[in-house]
Amino acid sequence: MIVCTGVGPGHVDFLTRWAEELISEADVVAGFDAVVDVVRSVIPQSAEIVTMGYKDQVAKLEEVARAHHAGKRCVVVFMGDIHFSGFQLLERVERACGHAVETVPGISSAQILASRGRVCFDETTFLTLHRRGDLEPFLRHLVHVLEDGRNAIVIPRPWDFMPKDIAAWLVARFVSGEHPVEVWENLTRSEAEWRGTLGDCTRDFSDMSIMLIRTLTPMASQIESA
């Protein structure tokens, strides 16, 4: 058996009961170091822990796949929710196993940020840049999102395209630098790490950051008047 599950945005309090049950009954728990650390208190002492990084993930997932094919209960843990951000890792798991695997949803950092920032997804678009390959199509989509008067929640690419790079790219494409921006690094806190405008977003943030770019003109309420 092998299952891939999201574990929430970085704190065990956001772990779903379904994911907790899977992890607590696993023979093998695998994932990137920071993700495994989130659920380490739930992993049974009898379980084998397989941690990985960007450079050795293919070899480590092949190790997990061998355990799966040997009949062990394997759980691969993902930060947030797999289908919000992490689909390329899921592809690697399935390639190693040679078949499609079951996925279990988690709570995404985008959902927590929407709650913290008090924005709703009918007025907000979510984009993840946390992927390998060409980002240009996704960035062009981000420009259209902002031109359409919507908010944007954006997960940066931690190794080379962070909030300051996103802001600089947008401003260079004539997106107004006056868009209000929030960057969050720890979503268990009640306040953003940084608030300002797109034009002022020039500082460095950790690889756990997520960005909210607000529309210049918030949508008016469409509920009936009191």
Regions found by a protein language model. Give the residues of each.
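Class I S-adenosyl-L-methionine
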Residues: 1-104, 112, 200-201, 208-212, ...
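A contiguous loop/helix-start segment that scaffolds small-molecule binding in enzyme catalytic cores
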Residues: 2-4, 72-74, 82, 146-226
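Short gly/pro/ser/thr-enriched loop/turn and capping motifs at secondary-structure boundaries
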Residues: 36-38, 57, 108-112, 132-134, ...
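Short, well-ordered secondary-structure micro-motifs
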Residues: 42, 87-88, 113-116, 137-139, ...
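Short loop/edge segments at beta-strand edges and connector loops
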Residues: 53, 105, 128, 185
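Flexible, glycine/proline-enriched loop segments at strand-loop-helix junctions
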Residues: 78, 100, 125-130, 151-158
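Short, structured loop/turn "capping" segments at alpha-beta junctions
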Residues: 103, 120-125, 176-181
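Short, glycine-/small-residue-rich phosphate/pyrophosphate-handling segment
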Residues: 114-144, 148
